A protein has these predicted regions:
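Phosphate-binding loop of NTP-binding sites
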Residues: 98-248, 252-260, 463, 472, ...
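Residue-level signal for inorganic ion chemistry
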Residues: 9, 45, 64, 116, ...
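Extended acidic/charged loop-beta regions that coordinate divalent cations
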Residues: 177-180, 190-218, 254-298, 337-349
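Conserved RecA-like helicase motor-core motifs
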Residues: 155-162, 268-269, 445-449
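ATP-dependent carboxylate-amine ligase
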Residues: 1-18, 40-46, 56-62, 81, ...
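Short, hydrophobic beta-strand segments that form beta-sheet elements in well-ordered domains
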Residues: 33-35, 67-75, 243-247, 263-267, ...
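Short, basic phosphate-binding NTP loop
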Residues: 1-133, 143, 149, 451-463
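Short acidic/polar active-site loop segments enriched in Thr and Asp
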Residues: 70-71, 182, 206, 420
Length: 495
């Protein structure tokens, strides 16, 4: 974060000082990071007192100061130097972050954090910072990681870790930027209409990327049209001096060209796009190879990430980098070196016994499930002798009334793609629908097996996995299959 005094921060967020005099607040500067976990506090930092599932950050204020924080942003006095903001009602857009906020204290601290991030981002933009916003139903984190890699040769980049893209992660990431930051890459998610507009108001992007409109969070939005309208809030937030990158292979995204005042750059797999990919091939590990065309130039691209779906992600990242002044050669080199960064997102590891594990267990929706299954069967059949393919699938959350039909569809798809073994993890109605769909599509014997939990799935794999098999582990994060995938990578086959 930029260097600010406690008094300046109090003025920005509209808070009052507690347990510190005005003179002390004017003299004491926040030179460290802003943290909501007292264990992560750095010397000179600012601690956010937020309510959590098991504890309230206000109870850890003293520990944070002992760890080096110079002040706490809180909703009540905490016995150590603090900026206190008045509690306020939690709003729907913050519900996912503040589900344990019973008195409005968390909503107040979060709103103050947003005001601080907005002030800091405005000052940094005046100093030359370029802000890039990314949204889409799937692929945001992978694209964010690719974009951070291709921008790195051009200057200092700040991007969120993992999928830290909500009402807390967004301003927290903004406050990671300093005067030396050239590019701030922000991933923007939404659970309700207005979420993306709210995030964009904190750090208005001069470059926006819209990847796709799918069915993630369909339960919250009710329709794909409502999802598209919310994703369109990002290009709508870009000024006429900015640039909007649209993946025109998705018709709902292509239609957003009429909803922005900014210049539009179209990317896709057809020659009519501004940045486009020629014929795509995949190697034995499903890593795409293609020729990228842009501005009457072309260059061969060999990606280090896995899956055909990464083509559009990489094109969007490339388009941003080209807009920022990168050469085609710089983009190609950076993409070739940019492997998976964020944990449990298409991480591919091959063990000593030849078993390949595709760990994509952080998140899942119907579109990303389909992409994962296609990558699985490709890896199993390429590179010589056909290998057995295993799909270890958990629940896709937040699909609302479509949950049963979408899980049924994925079970049927696994059979149509000729996945050798489908292990359905979980006992709810959605998981029963996935197993039933596979059986009705033509699965026989033990091709589709339903188990109660991740431990049961791991026990089955330990008993039946053979050298050379290929295993996809995928589910929404709440299913907890990431630990299963980690365990598979770490151990030998047990017969």
């Amino acid at each position: 974060m930029i260097d600010l005094s406690i008094a300046q921060i109090a003025d920005i967020v509209g808070g009052r000082l507690a347990d510190i005099t005005p003179d002390q607040a004017a003299e004491t500067r926040v030179t460290g990071t802003v943290e909501f976990d007292s264990r992560a506090v750095t010397p000179g930092g600012l601690f956010l007192a937020l309510p959590g599932a098991r504890s309230d950050g206000h109870d850890f204020a003293a520990a944070a100061v002992c760890a080096g924080a110079v002040a706490v942003l809180a909703a009540r006095p905490v016995g150590v130097p603090a900026i206190v903001v008045a509690p306020e009602p939690a709003v729907d857009s913050a519900a996912s972050v503040l589900e344990h906020d019973t008195d409005g204290s968390g909503a107040a601290v979060l709103a103050a954090l947003a005001r601080l991030a907005a002030a800091v981002s405005a000052e940094l933009v005046d100093g030359g910072l370029t802000i890039v916003g990314i949204t889409g139903s799937s692929g945001k984190t992978s694209t964010k990681d690719l974009l951070a890699a291709v921008l790195a040769p051009l200057g200092e980049v700040v991007a969120p870790p993992g999928s830290f893209n909500n009402e807390l992660g967004h301003p927290w990431t903004v406050l990671r930027a300093t005067e030396s930051t050239d590019y701030l890459v922000l991933e923007m998610s939404a659970r309700h209409p207005g979420n993306i507009a709210e995030l964009a108001s904190i750090a208005p992007p001069s470059i926006a990327v819209v990847l796709n409109v799918g069915t993630a969070h369909l339960g919250e939005f009710g329709s794909r049209e409502a999802i598209a309208a919310t994703k369109a809030e990002l290009p709508q937030a870009v000024p006429s001096s900015g640039v909007v990158i649209l993946n025109v292979d998705d018709t709902a995204v292509a239609a957003m060209a009429d909803q922005t005042a900014a210049r539009v750059v179209r990317v896709g797999r057809t020659a009519g796009a501004d940045v486009w990919a020629g014929p795509v091939t995949l190697d034995a590990l499903a890593r795409p190879r293609f020729t990228m065309h842009a501005a009457e130039s072309q260059i061969d691209i060999a990606l280090a990430v896995h899956g055909d779906h990464q083509v559009s992600n990489s094109l969007c990242a490339a388009a941003v980098a080209l807009e920022c002044g990168a050469s085609m050669e710089q983009v190609a080199h950076a993409l070739a070196a940019a492997g998976p960064v964020s944990k449990h997102r298409m991480q591919v590891a091959t063990r000593g016994d030849g078993v390949t594990v595709i760990n994509d267990a952080y998140n899942a929706n119907p579109d990303s499930m389909q992409a994962g299954l296609k990558a699985l069967v490709w890896m199993a059949r390429e590179g010589g002798e056909k290998r057995r393919s295993w799909a270890i699938l958990g629940e896709m959350a937040e699909l609302g009334d479509d949950a049963i039909s979408e899980h049924d569809r994925i079970g049927r798809l696994a059979v149509r793609l000729d996945v050798s073994r489908l292990i359905v993890v979980g006992t709810g109605r959605s998981m029963s629908a996935m197993h039933h769909g596979a059986v009705m599509e033509g699965s026989w014997g033990s091709e589709s097996t339903m188990v109660a939990n991740a431990d049961a799935a791991l026990a089955l794999l330990r008993a039946e996995l053979e050298a050379g098999d290929v295993v996809l582990v995928k589910a929404s994060n709440a299913a907890g299959l990431g630990a299963l995938a980690d365990a598979l990578v770490a151990e030998d086959v047990r017969r």
